[in-house]
Amino acid sequence: MTNIRKSHPLIKIINESFIDLPAPSNISAWWNFGSLLGVCLILQILTGLFLAMHYTSDTATAFSSVTHICRDVNYGWIIRYMHANGASMFFICLFMHIGRGMYYGSYTFSETWNIGILLLFAVMATAFMGYVLPWGQMSFWGATVITNLLSAIPYIGTNLVEWIWGGFSVDKATLTRFFAFHFILPFIIAALAAIHLLFLHETGSNNPSGLMSNSDKIPFHPYYTIKDILGLMFLILTLMLLVLFSPDLLGDPDNYTPANPLNTPPHIKPEWYFLFAYAILRSIPNKLGGVMALVLSILILAIVPLLHTSKQRSMMFRPLSQCLFWLLVADLLTLTWIGGQPVEHPFITIGQLASILYFSTILVLMPISGTIENRLLKW
């Protein structure tokens, strides 16, 4: 008799995805982040569900409902902080996952890569709308500033912004629809993640060498299930250290003040994981130009496969490209720091230089380095 996990229509899918899946024998810890992102998504959906049971999406009661969750609901404080800091862990894993894809040339799986970009946009949209829900000062002003950027779109901009707001300013209608979208988007993300996996399993995983590994595959279980559990332990440990010892470390103190349309905070800034894009937005004096740079800073990932000039897939044996990759990482950290600083000298200049370096590294320097490496190897 055939084993049930190989014959049952439903269990067979799970078996082929997580148990008998042939995986390269040499994939490193950088391949752990996919499973960690899945865990983060499940954690966010579960904690979010329990928060939604007590939250009210009304401008009059939203702030006090979050306070009520933290003070009166059984373990509400830990659910709230796990959800808030879980978003930070989600983005850390996301950035590591994308970095891994760029370093080892995983972007040559074009369908998987493009769905990954869609996932990134969906997660960013979800996180942005979630940040608005507590209805603190930074929630309100962040929503006002970021949605108002759409008014830079010629001809339809103003109408588009008012349509999104549901009125002439960020108000009750905006909060209600943001809550609705924030609730539904994670399920869309889960569906996209399943498609992401489907396309990945069509080609099989990449590996650090970037070479074909069909001749040397091992079953996913038990080798990589154990390895993923180790990564999961580190993730949970880091998250719980953050939640239990310094839950507000990554938040903004202004968000503990209820939203007030008549009082603007001194420095309006988004959560830390958007600061790099925010710095690029601010580095261009023109509003439309800034919005275009903001969108392109993420959308540029879509043309990374087209800019691959090297005859080697991975950067494992390409020292020049490795230097440029780590320059890009340092540049993104610089942009993140600049995004959190006030708009004054010398931060403006540093931000502009870092923005130029970001685009030129991806669009110009990396393709050139690939060509140079080909020449050096006489290919």
From Swiss-Prot:
Its cofactor is heme b. Binds 2 heme b groups non-covalently. Heme b b566 binds at H97, H196. Keywords: Electron transport, Heme, Iron, Membrane, Metal-binding, Mitochondrion, Mitochondrion inner membrane, Respiratory chain, Transmembrane, Transmembrane helix, Transport, Ubiquinone. GO terms for biological process: mitochondrial electron transport, ubiquinol to cytochrome c. The chain crosses the membrane at residues 33-53, 77-98, 113-133, 178-198, 226-246, 288-308, 320-340, 347-367. One of its GO terms (molecular function) is metal ion binding. CDD domains: cytochrome_b_C, Cytochrome_b_N. A ubiquinone binds at H201. The cytochrome bc1 complex contains 11 subunits: 3 respiratory subunits (MT-CYB, CYC1 and UQCRFS1), 2 core proteins (UQCRC1 and UQCRC2) and 6 low-molecular weight proteins (UQCRH/QCR6, UQCRB/QCR7, UQCRQ/QCR8, UQCR10/QCR9, UQCR11/QCR10 and a cleavage product of UQCRFS1). This cytochrome bc1 complex then forms a dimer. This is Cytochrome b.
